[in-house]
Amino acid sequence: MNLPILYSYRRCPYAMRARMALKLADIAVEIREISLREKPKHMLQVSPKGTVPVLVLVDGTVIDESLAIMLWCMEQAASKQTTLKYEGEYAALQANIHAGCRALVLVNDTDFKKNLDAYKYPERYSQHGIQLDLQPNLHLEHAKLKLQTQLKYRTQGEVFLAHLESLLQTNTYSFANTFNFANSLNFADIAIFPFIRQFAMVDSAWFENSNYPKLRAWLHNWVDSSLFKSVMTKDPTFVG
């Protein structure tokens, strides 16, 4: 049986949300776990930009943006009225893709992602946009600038965290605090979750003591979900 091919990288947040959508829609695919240092030739042929996820359908159609893959999954599930294996109703996911939800995901994928990258890798940035790793001999100054940079971008990232916390308080966009997936699961949850997970992992002690209790509970619920665990199994690296 021929299956769609998904080129993926286990720890990539974009690939995570694509895998979650595929699993939720009960769409079987052949997962090809790539090496970032030696990307498969076929993947580069069908998607020269060289980033994951890349979904190659049986008819040769290529979908190489994670949000587009999520939307395609929803269309497939709706057309065949798939019986879902995992928590939630796909109708709830589909119903909540309105303008506000899309705007929330857009902020995640632009401003928040930039702050996340700088927070995770402060050595690549400084207060003035200078790469810190160009000053390897200035150890004390390097450490000081690195910490200042990390705190700066964490603070900027917190603007989005605070907004999500407020949404969880008010149940806006079904980004709810009930954690009942049948009622609260939506497009934004899956699209945003992998990035909040990464932000929290930079300094888990700080996050666990931060002033975002609703967001923290929401994150823990997703991390512990059978859906997430099912897409985080380790696959051998594809060679080809």
Positions of the model-derived regions?
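GST-like domain detector, emphasizing the conserved glutathione-binding G-site
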Residues: 1-151
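Glycine-rich, flexible loop/turn motifs
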Residues: 39-42, 169, 227
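GST-like fold's C-terminal all-alpha helical module
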Residues: 104, 108-220
